[in-house]
């Protein structure tokens, strides 16, 4: 506001909106390239690059008690509008739960080393517990810990007692290489990580109850894994799946996996698939709209949920719990 040290901005949102935000103080007039505003509509790719350069200077809202570190390490704060869908489990952050085991996976095939977290929500009948593999595990283990929400929904009878395996991505470069349709990553997981996990805990190894879950590249990776190894992974939880890959800017109608489905890619076994995308993430929303009917043509059970939000972990956390409940409800 002129003549003061107060910054002011306003917008209008629907009452069902949920999203995260941060403050990025700047007095620079050239934070975004000129081409971002040359057309009638802002150029989203140019805007994206401008925001990414600004994020290291972001701060959380100092008056908002609900804050965390986003996927790129910058502070975020939460905003839930009055009619945003409930997120059961996340409202009980103090729910007691058992200890989380953290191990190191030293992969010969991938030639790297990373953390893996193992968490169980019950041990009365270990061989009957389903398994869920969560990609971007470092986020759900450290930035926005998922343990209390999983335990709270298990205690409430919404989720069965289960084993959760959270896999670190190491860094953004490794993530961008390993998660998008990378057979080497999934072969290493099956040949190296799962055999080691069997020496540490037990679960029901039927594919009908084994979930692979991920967001963005992780959502793409989850569906890729199940389509190619259905004998191991029978349930998919894909949130904001990056089905544009590998051509973000030039192929809004779909990337490699969509093209393969259109070309007749058939899975040997029927899968259970839970898709979710935000209506405020245009490209992601478009490609999820495109892949949904393709999966309906070939798969046993596909559920598609559209969220009034963007490419945002604050939205994903609710869908993660809802997706697990839906996938396991008819399988157990």
State where each predicted segment sits.
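Non-catalytic cap/lid and distal C-terminal segments of serine-dependent acyl enzymes
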Residues: 1-332
């Amino acid at each position: 506001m002129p003549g003061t040290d107060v910054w002011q901005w306003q917008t209008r949102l629907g009452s069902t909106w949920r999203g995260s935000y941060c403050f990025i103080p700047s007095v620079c007039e050239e934070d975004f390239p000129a081409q971002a505003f040359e057309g009638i509509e802002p150029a989203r790719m140019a805007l994206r690059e401008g925001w990414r350069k600004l994020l290291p200077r972001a701060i959380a809202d100092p008056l908002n008690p609900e804050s965390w570190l986003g996927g790129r390490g910058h502070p975020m704060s939460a905003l839930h509008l009055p009619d945003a869908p409930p997120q059961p489990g996340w409202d009980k952050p103090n729910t007691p739960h058992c200890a989380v085991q953290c191990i190191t996976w030293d992969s010969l095939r991938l030639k790297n080393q990373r953390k893996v977290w193992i968490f169980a929500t019950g041990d009365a009948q270990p061989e009957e517990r389903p398994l869920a593999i969560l990609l971007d595990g470092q986020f759900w283990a450290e930035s926005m810990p998922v343990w209390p929400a999983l335990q709270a929904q298990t205690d409430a009878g919404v989720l069965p007692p289960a084993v959760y395996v959270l896999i670190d991505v190491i860094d953004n470069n490794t993530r961008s290489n390993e998660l998008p349709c990378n057979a080497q990553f999934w072969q290493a997981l099956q040949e190296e990580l799962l055999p080691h996990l069997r020496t540490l805990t037990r679960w029901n190894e039927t594919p009908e109850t084994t979930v692979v879950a991920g967001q963005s590249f992780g959502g793409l990776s989850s569906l890729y894994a199940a389509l190619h190894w259905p004998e191991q992974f029978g349930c998919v939880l894909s949130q904001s799946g990056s089905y544009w890959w590998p051509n973000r800017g030039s192929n809004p109608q779909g990337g490699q996996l969509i093209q393969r489905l259109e070309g007749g890619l058939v899975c040997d076994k029927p899968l259970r698939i839970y898709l979710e995308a935000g209506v405020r993430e245009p490209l992601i929303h478009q490609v999820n709209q495109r892949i949904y009917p393709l999966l309906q043509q070939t798969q046993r059970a596909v559920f598609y949920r559209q969220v009034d939000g963007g490419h945002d972990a604050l939205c994903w956390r609710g869908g993660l719990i809802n997706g697990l409940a839906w996938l396991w409800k008819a399988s157990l």
